[in-house]
């Protein structure tokens, strides 16, 4: 038997969804995929069900570049709640301990936050998708099993206190700009532990993921309303071009002859590559007409070697 053809349209591009609270990232992905009647789609990094905000969804060729988005920096706006410890480190979990936080001040929070700016080693929460012996940690946590987790290096570039509301259960609104793999829930619980009050995430909104911002996003409800009973093609004007997924990489325009060989998986020589980056750096590759061919890596021989290629029709 031959390969079964995927149902749906062979579209390519990216759309930035404003994920609603309460939905899983995969659930949102499947709804968007159905709305566009796409044959291939994937998201670029899960958000907790409690979280809202930027969830880039890639279609077709754009899925080949999703790993680059997974590796990108992120920005979040969150509300940390002090005086309560939960089993999930967010407000979806069960409160395990309550401590009077009425003496907590804004100055205390500012001082605690400052200790987490820069390169830090962070212990991931048990309620996470990280795996131990092939099993997600959150599944172990649901069974009441807690295992030791190794600290992982992450970077918090910016950590800003936006507002502070004192009380027996105090709240702090914060903005965090951080590297991939940073758990905002761990920041909340770790800072709460430092303050000897306990802490968890009450609200979480991702406002940026790589080159994508919340201003570029659209809700599922808006897409559903626009499509109505019409064909999926009416939504295609929302699609961003495939190469925007790697917009942070410098671009290189090849002549038609070099583009031909590059599109067939061959490394090609170009004297301009070292002006774009160093050995191992990535570049976006286009032909002379501006057509996107994929992502290449600069080699020590002055060539660009294909890493991810888009389909050429």
UniProtKB/Swiss-Prot annotation:
It catalyses: uridine(55) in tRNA = pseudouridine(55) in tRNA. One of its GO terms (biological process) is tRNA pseudouridine synthesis. SUPFAM superfamilies: Pseudouridine synthase, PUA domain-like. The keyword Membrane does not apply. Its EC number is 5.4.99.25. Keywords: Isomerase, tRNA processing. The active site is at 48 (nucleophile). One of its GO terms (molecular function) is tRNA pseudouridine(55) synthase activity. Responsible for synthesis of pseudouridine from uracil-55 in the psi GC loop of transfer RNAs. Belongs to the pseudouridine synthase TruB family. Type 1 subfamily. This is tRNA pseudouridine synthase B. The lineage of its organism: Bacteria, Pseudomonadati, Pseudomonadota, Gammaproteobacteria, Cellvibrionales. The gene is truB.
């Amino acid at each position: 038997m031959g390969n079964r053809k995927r149902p749906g349209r062979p579209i390519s591009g990216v759309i930035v969804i404003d994920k609603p609270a309460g939905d899983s990232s995969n659930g949102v992905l499947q709804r968007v995929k159905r709305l566009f009647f796409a044959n291939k789609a994937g998201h670029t990094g899960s958000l907790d069900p409690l979280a809202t905000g930027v969830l880039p969804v890639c279609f077709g060729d754009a899925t080949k570049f999703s790993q680059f988005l997974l590796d990108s920096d992120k920005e979040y706006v969150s509300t940390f709640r002090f005086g309560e410890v939960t089993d999930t480190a967010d407000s979806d979990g069960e409160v395990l301990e309550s401590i009077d936080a009425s003496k907590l001040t804004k100055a205390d929070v500012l001082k605690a936050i400052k200790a987490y700016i820069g390169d830090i080693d962070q212990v991931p929460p048990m309620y996470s998708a990280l795996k131990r012996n092939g099993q997600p940690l959150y599944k172990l946590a649901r069974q009441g099993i807690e295992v030791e987790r190794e600290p992982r290096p992450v970077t918090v570039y910016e950590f800003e206190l936006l507002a502070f509301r004192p009380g027996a259960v105090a709240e702090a609104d914060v903005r965090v700009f951080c590297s991939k793999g940073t758990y905002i829930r761990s920041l909340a619980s770790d800072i709460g532990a430092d303050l000897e009050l306990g802490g968890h995430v009450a609200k979480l909104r991702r406002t940026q993921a790589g080159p994508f911002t919340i201003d570029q996003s659209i809700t599922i409800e808006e897409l559903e309303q626009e499509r109505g009973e019409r064909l999926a093609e009416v939504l295609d004007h929302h699609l961003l071009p495939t190469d925007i997924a790697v917009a942070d990489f410098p671009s290189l325009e090849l002549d038609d002859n070099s583009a031909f060989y590059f599109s067939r998986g061959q490394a090609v020589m170009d004297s301009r590559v070292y002006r774009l980056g160093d050995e191992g750096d990535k570049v976006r590759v286009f032909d002379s007409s501006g057509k996107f061919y994929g992502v290449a890596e600069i080699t020590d021989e002055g060539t660009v070697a294909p890493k991810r290629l888009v389909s050429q029709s």
